[in-house]
Amino acid sequence: MTLKELLVGFGTQVRSIWMIGLHAFAKRETRMYPEEPVYLPPRYRGRIVLTRDPDGEERCVACNLCAVACPVGCISLQKTETKDGRWYPEFFRINFSRCIFCGLCEEACPTTAIQLTPDFEMGEYKRQDLVYEKEDLLISGPGKYPEYNFYRMAGMAIDGKDKGEAENEAKPIDVKSLLP
């Protein structure tokens, strides 16, 4: 072993001890989770929920756009119709063990029924418990869009009533009368 190799080896040892000394007294990055809250960015995408419109009815019209937009195919639903002609899902199922929380289902939803919340505590012991049904996903409130009601905004006719005759619905605008 030459003197040069000996000095290089000694230098690396001193540098390693110096680095350990610097990091030994630095602030720790590990946070104790339950005691210290976790910082979530404003646009954090967590658990998926189904919201209700201001009247208290579920917003989902079972259009199946969320299931088509999902890249992993974790959403499944079946459409049914009420007596007054409104569509709603007979069942709505999300498999959270497959979900990648990309938010494409929220973007595809025309009624803002699907929304991603900042809830991230979804650990389960059995994989079957990560399959959420409609009853598990429905929340009691309107979510991020409190005043939005799809049937009022879309102008869809309900059986037995023309457009504009439903409850709390404005009359449709005659576009031809607005022309110069």
From Swiss-Prot:
Assigned EC number: 7.1.1.-
Cofactor binding notes: Binds 2 [4Fe-4S] clusters per subunit.
Catalytic reaction annotation: a quinone + NADH + 5 H(+)(in) = a quinol + NAD(+) + 4 H(+)(out)
GO molecular function: 4 iron, 4 sulfur cluster binding; iron ion binding; NADH:ubiquinone reductase (non-electrogenic) activity; quinone binding
Membrane topology: Peripheral membrane protein
Localization of this protein: Cell inner membrane
Residues engaged in binding [4Fe-4S] cluster 2: 70, 99, 102, 105
Annotated TM spans: none
Family: Belongs to the complex I 23 kDa subunit family.
Name used for this protein in its record: NADH-quinone oxidoreductase subunit I
Species annotation: Shigella dysenteriae serotype 1 (strain Sd197)
Lineage: Bacteria, Pseudomonadati, Pseudomonadota, Gammaproteobacteria, Enterobacterales
Gene: nuoI
